[in-house]
């Protein structure tokens, strides 16, 4: 029985109790939000070492880290290092997007290594296997896709992205609304290509009940993918994006009524002035289900720095109600991220999540900032390092800048404002 079905029956699960303790909420409040579909707890019954996380309304903003192999770069040990680094940096979830090598082996290793929820996009494995076998993705057999979904669920995958909103209905009008970057979602483009070449409906949409049955069996949370998300500022909030969102809104309630936990994915590339509208529209159309956003990136001109453009957009989106931020690394649009890129991406989006929690009135976030300010006033460096989002980097920079032997730092030295005011006897200026 899924977390959602148990919540609807009034049962408080161990996972709900863990989430309640972390969020400083009552278990009953968490149960109620899960029952309403406003909070999800991705927790596959087969993920043995999982520390459950709650995602959704009224909870702290969570951050996901994408990783995985590609056909060009396939080093298993690197991906496992990324898992460790991402979790250490504060990632609340991991997605394995591998497309190269032994996909079953790497996924199982990641699940075994990860104490946080693990997500996948099953279509990637089905497409990769089809391409390797036939050299033509259009020959993908829907039965293979569902076999992959069942296998991944049995392995312990906690949430799955499925692009069920990309349908033949939308395909009919696709070319009526031209875009600068067309379709940038891998899952969306694969689905469109398959439907066009086979003249058939998206199998995940056509057999949605079959998909739900698998999810219900293992308590896999569905993440309804945004296959038509805008891939450029010029395409943000266009007709295709909204058409897909409306379809996803229909499927949210249907899935929830079948006892399956569900969240909804969102854009993409969105200018700052459109972020509030995007979040509120999604929440309205999708019954306040948890909203999972990729950034969003607020400008297109920063390759090499897109963890920053994503953090800016993520802070805004989360402030207006987004619940789950997918990180973006400095390597976005350029190549597969390194271990160092993963750490940078997680920390950038953790800063965004914390900034949003702070603005949303989260007492724990406010207390942490307050304590940091007190430590700075007291020139208490050890306490500052403890409270820092990346203690190791803060400590290293202080040492490298020649500050470790002085009470203040090498920026101001004896002219340190804090030092001067402290020597004044604690009076307020």
UniProtKB/Swiss-Prot annotation:
Q: Which residues bind substrate?
A: 66, 95, 124, 163, 185-187, 226-229, 265, 292
Q: Where does [4Fe-4S] cluster bind?
A: 409, 412, 416
Paste the cofactor note. Binds 1 [4Fe-4S] cluster per subunit. The cluster is coordinated with 3 cysteines and an exchangeable S-adenosyl-L-methionine.
Gene3D superfamilies, from UniProt?
6.10.250.620, Radical SAM ThiC family, central domain (3.20.20.540)
The pathway this protein participates in, as annotated, is: Cofactor biosynthesis; thiamine diphosphate biosynthesis
What general EC class does the enzyme of this chain belong to?
lyase
Q: Which Pfam families match?
A: ThiC_Rad_SAM
Gene Ontology BP term (one)? thiamine biosynthetic process
Indicate yes or no for the key word NAD.
no
Report the family membership. Answer: Belongs to the ThiC family.
Q: What does this protein do?
A: Catalyzes the synthesis of the hydroxymethylpyrimidine phosphate (HMP-P) moiety of thiamine from aminoimidazole ribotide (AIR) in a radical S-adenosyl-L-methionine (SAM)-dependent reaction.
What's this protein's name? Answer: Phosphomethylpyrimidine synthase
Whichever gene encodes this chain, its name is: thiC
């Amino acid at each position: 029985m899924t977390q959602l079905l148990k919540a609807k029956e009034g049962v408080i699960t161990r996972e709900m109790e863990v989430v309640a303790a972390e969020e400083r909420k009552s278990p009953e409040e968490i149960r109620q939000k899960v029952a309403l579909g406003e909070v999800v707890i991705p927790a596959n019954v087969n993920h043995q070492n999982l520390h459950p996380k709650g995602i959704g309304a009224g909870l702290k903003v969570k951050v996901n880290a994408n990783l995985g192999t590609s056909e060009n770069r396939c080093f298993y040990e690197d991906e496992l290092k990324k898992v460790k680094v991402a979790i250490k940096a504060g990632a609340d979830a991991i997605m394995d997007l591998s497309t190269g090598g032994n996909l079953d082996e790497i996924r199982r290793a990641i699940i075994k290594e990860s104490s946080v929820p693990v997500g996948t996009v099953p279509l990637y494995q089905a497409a990769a296997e089809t391409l390797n076998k036939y050299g033509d993705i259009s020959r993908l057999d829907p039965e293979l896709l569902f076999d992959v979904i069942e296998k991944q669920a049995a392995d312990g995958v906690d949430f799955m992205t499925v692009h069920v909103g990309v349908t033949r209905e939308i395909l009919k009008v696709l070319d009526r609304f031209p875009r600068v970057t067309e379709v940038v979602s891998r899952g969306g483009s694969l689905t469109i290509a398959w439907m066009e070449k086979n003249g058939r409906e998206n199998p995940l949409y056509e057999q949605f009940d079959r998909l739900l049955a698998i999810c219900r069996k293992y308590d896999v949370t569905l993440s309804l993918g945004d296959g038509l998300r805008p891939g450029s500022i010029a395409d943000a909030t266009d007709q295709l994006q909204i058409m897909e969102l409306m379809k996803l809104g229909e499927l949210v309630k249907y899935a929830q009524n079948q006892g399956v936990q569900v969240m909804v994915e969102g854009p993409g590339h969105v200018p700052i002035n459109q972020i509030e509208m995007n979040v509120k529209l999604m929440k309205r159309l999708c019954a306040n289900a948890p909203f999972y956003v990729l950034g969003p990136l607020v400008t297109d001109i920063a390759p090499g720095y897109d963890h920053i453009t994503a953090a800016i957009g993520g802070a805004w989106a989360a402030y207006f109600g987004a619940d789950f931020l997918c990180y973006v690394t400095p390597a976005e649009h350029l190549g597969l991220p390194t271990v160092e890129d993963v750490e940078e991406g997680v920390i950038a989006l953790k800063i965004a999540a914390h900034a949003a929690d702070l603005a949303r009135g989260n007492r724990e976030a406010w207390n942490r900032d307050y304590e940091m300010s007190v430590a700075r006033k007291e020139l208490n460096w050890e306490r500052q390092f403890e409270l820092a989002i990346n203690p190791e980097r803060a400590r290293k920079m202080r040492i490298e800048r020649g500050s470790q032997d002085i009470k203040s730092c090498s920026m101001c030295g004896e002219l340190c404002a804090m030092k001067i005011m402290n020597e004044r006897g604690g009076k307020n200026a």
